[in-house]
Amino acid sequence: MESNKDEAERCISIALKAIQSNQPDRALRFLEKAQRLYPTPRVRALIESLNQKPQTAGDQPPPTDTTHATHRKAGGTDAPSANGEAGGESTKGYTAEQVAAVKRVKQCKDYYEILGVSRGASDEDLKKAYRRLALKFHPDKNHAPGATEAFKAIGTAYAVLSNPEKRKQYDQFGDDKSQAARHGHGHGDFHRGFEADISPEDLFNMFFGGGFPSSNVHVYSNGRMRYTYQQRQDRRDNQGDGGLGVFVQLMPILILILVSALSQLMVSSPPYSLSPRPSVGHIHRRVTDHLGVVYYVGDTFSEEYTGSSLKTVERNVEDDYIANLRNNCWKEKQQKEGLLYRARYFGDTDMYHRAQKMGTPSCSRLSEVQASLHG
């Protein structure tokens, strides 16, 4: 089965190059062979995509650079598109299918429709939809007028719907700003009321091997892990209410701030950190007895924690360390898988080999720790 998988990967690579060379028949032939050798949803989706094209095999010869629908002027100058884009996008060739795809995104009424998923879509469904569409509309791949804005809209849709809080607000209140924009300017306004906490390019890089941005990160506070979203408060259109109305709107926020402040006062911070933190006095290096995890403590730690209390602290240190490893392992796997997927899609052999050589040190260390725990 493993040999079939390798052969299937080879067929996929050939098929992707054929797609780039505008040879759909050849691409379809190798994709079908790959699906017979090692069936995968990705290959099936590519086959369906090729089969859905209006031109069927044998109707006309494969397009070349001279017959490809580039939508250029004969004199070599580029006509600006309906949304004002000229030069950058329209100097390169694009197909009628790409133009139609951009038009479809422009006409979508909500984020679910942009991604092509139902309102009950799971996180995995959202990831699959974004992964497929982001590659299809990325400015490096799609040069049709409006493709860049469509790419941004897809990124914003995923960023909002993948954030539980933003998705809840979006489902509850809809997108009033975008509706107003559509009534005023017609379809095709990508600037919607809900904003993403991450740029479309950063999101794309996070999925396909360009690293993880700092705007949406895992934060370790006092040795404990939590996930933070940088949430922006939506501006209200209806301003000018009386002072009482403003107070009523601000009251939930004031209560939340008060409760948070009281919580911070009532909860004591852990007596250790996983890295040096001079600001809280955690500068003295120690190592746990069981797993040998390095942690840092304050001046009076040795006096305050001995015997069973010390064992409890070190158990917490190791739990935090393992949680940290799991998180970093997940990110390393996502980065590697994203780069492999991108390399296969674009038929980039160098990128594929580079992705294969990428290490996952956190995953390796996690395996060692788990072996020690169960050994």
From Swiss-Prot:
GO terms for biological process: cellular response to misfolded protein; chaperone cofactor-dependent protein refolding; ERAD pathway; protein-containing complex assembly. The modification N-acetylmethionine is found at M1. The modification Pros-methylhistidine is found at H185. CDD domains: DnaJ. Residues 1-243 are cytoplasmic. Methylated at His-185 by METTL9. Residues 49-58 have a biased composition (Polar residues). It holds the Pfam family DnaJ. This is DnaJ homolog subfamily B member 12.
